[in-house]
Amino acid sequence: WREIHTQLHAQVIEMGLRLSDKPAPYEQIHRALLAGLLGNIGCRDLEGDTYQGAREIKFVVSSGSGLRKQKYKWVIAAELQETNRVYARTAAKIEPEWIESAAEHLVKRHYFDPHWEKSTAQVSAYERVTLYGLTVTLKRRIHFGAVDPTQSREIFIRQALVAQEYETRATF
């Protein structure tokens, strides 16, 4: 990270921009780095120290890293080095929400199991978000009407109105 900091500092001075007096918090720094290192993210497998990375890459955090023992679920690496294994060097903990916001234009969204949700009185579905084949969000409940209004309407008619699952005070 020091080398990246040095390069950025030199560019800021060269551009004539003024430096902030306040140090940036951890989240801001790593969100900024994430935008340029999306191919170097990984999610830890449930068993062992292996991380599943983007584009089907598997790696481990290098033995010299302080993160090696921490076993965070999501990490980003400044460098992936391949020897007999692929090692993540200069790694840091990240949150999956950061990935989604940094890669909004690159993530793929898959919607499944649209259904009538009586408790919220809306047609809901589940969303799976992936980036380069890596699942960022597995099963998030969403309002399906914004995704597919036509199918949402059909589900509403079949599962809410015909099945008399829709509760309203309106007179029909």
Question: At which residue positions do the language-model features occur?
Answer:
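Extended, charged helical/alpha-beta scaffold domains that provide interaction surfaces
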Residues: 1-172
